[in-house]
Amino acid sequence: PRFGREAVRTWLRNVLYSPPPKAGEDRRSVRTIAVVPVHHGASVEAVAQGLARALQTRGATARIDGHCVDAEGGRRLCQLSMDAADSIRYLDDLETEFRYVIYQTDTLSSEWAARCLRQADRVVAVASSGVPAQRTEMSELLRKHADGADVELVIVGDGVTDPLAWRELNGARLHHRVGVGRRSDFERLARLLTGRAVGVAFGGGGARGFAHIGLL
């Protein structure tokens, strides 16, 4: 009984503190997604890879980690200034060629991290379960460079975590949990980010609604 009460209490907190999700049309317009860490050691690589595989079934997907090089000049185009014409042209061409582009950064603060946020329609902020919520350089970057893109928190692992504290520190609207290697988790995340998720409505009033949850 105690576990059940705690589960319901957690569920209610998440519902009450979560703003309504964007309409499906808004989410279906998402083409560029930044995957960023909110603390050192966050599993950014695993999340970006899993999300890219899931999105690939919906359209051509590119994942860029900041090491893109000009084959002719040998320059790291992604590391140039955000105002550099060659860099802007390179990323614009990618976004034209691919249905989805994932911008990945492993650093909390850098020119490339800021560019990832500037390019993104949606930001996926990655935290590891079990890590206490903390303000980091990425928290500041999100405030400066997200340019109105919605931020959604992804917690990796099943350990105890306070998602609401992480969300408050980083301005995230929603949070999701995924496990490394769990393909179904990333397919669900891809559906939610792109507005292709299917919801379930419970009817019959409060008591009956909770009864439906019990059946699930």
Kindly label every feature range from the protein language model.
Residues A7, G50, A54, R188, ...:
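Alpha-helical scaffold segments in soluble metabolic enzymes
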Residues G41-A42, D70, P132, V160:
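Flexible, glycine-rich phosphate/dinucleotide-binding loops
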Residues W11-R27:
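Intrinsically disordered or compositionally simple regulatory linkers and C-terminal tails
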Residues K22-V69, V198-G206:
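Walker A (P-loop) phosphate-binding motif
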Residues P1-V8:
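Cyclic-nucleotide recognition modules
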Residues A46-I102:
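Structured core of small recognition/catalytic domains
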Residues R31, R76-M82, I88-Y100, T105-L216:
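Patatin-like phospholipase
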